[in-house]
Amino acid sequence: MNKFVYIILFSSVVCLLSACGSDKEEMSRLGDDDAVWVNLDINVSLTDVMHSGITRAEGDGYENAANGYELMSTLRVIVVRPDNTVEENRFISFRDVLQHYGDERFKVRGRETKRVYLFANENSSIDIQSEDGTRFRLKEELERIKKGDAFPTETIGKLTVNLDGGNQLKVNPNYVPMNECHTVEVGDTDQKADLFIIRAAVKYSFYVKNESSHAKTVTGYSVHNMARQAYLLPRDVRYRDVEGSDGTIYKEIEAFEVPETEYYTYRFNASYSLPKNKEIILAPSCYFLEGKHVYEGEGGADEKKNYSVSLWVDGAELKGFLENVPQLPRNTHVKVYITIKNTSTDWKVDVRPYTEVPLEPDFGL
């Protein structure tokens, strides 16, 4: 199984106002005299999310983050009370990119159901757009949300990420955006809440092998049917728990929603020499938005043809369909393996989510 999971650990230390005489002045400042106040110690880690309709790569191999741009550079945690009041809005910037962060303490009111919004890498230069078409920087929009104000639920929920022209997401040096929203029951006793955050991107990588009798020149590739627009936050997403071979429980995406959007073809031009009996990796990998493109041919819809790619070799286009990819949810890595033979081309696709990667002492930016 290919795993991702961003786990946020909430350690809640409950304190009744009547039992905390030394904190009486602080509690009075925070709210009602009979309120229960809880310290939430937040711990964030990576884990794995997968779409249940996709055929996974063979085995239980993990897909590590390939570089620091796929990890966390910043994190924002917004806690919202049941009456839609913003209880906390905290921005955290890391000295190095991280796959784990913890022990960030929040004092919140207990005995309530909270919404917890998570935003990582909000400094990325992605194009964010509101429902009315206004474009702005995500960081500036999130900074406008003040503690004690009403949370703009509808506005934030309808924000979209947009790609113009034939572009891909620019993640270098801007990092992959990540986000999620969770509902958390906060009681009046110590507790934990395991949460996760996922990348708002789909990644493509290409591996080309030449088994023909002649050297080849690869001049680029095309990725077809990419969405121009996707929701910033996961929209109407449903997860289910799946047990891996090691007994660990992971998440699979059963359903998700996308806005009405156009689809386009991304073209990457280059020049690679490919000797016979050699394999090359077409660098760099590219990043796109999640989507639900539907192929409509003469025979009607065919989910085995929803997504396709092209490889340009010696001036000719070789095209293949990704038959095991009916939809493209966020947090997915599509690895396309292409084998060129004398009279044919073989296509194989592995689809993997990312998973946690141990950080070495010299890892980071």
What is the role of each PLM region?
Residues M1-A19:
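Sec-dependent bacterial lipoprotein signal peptides
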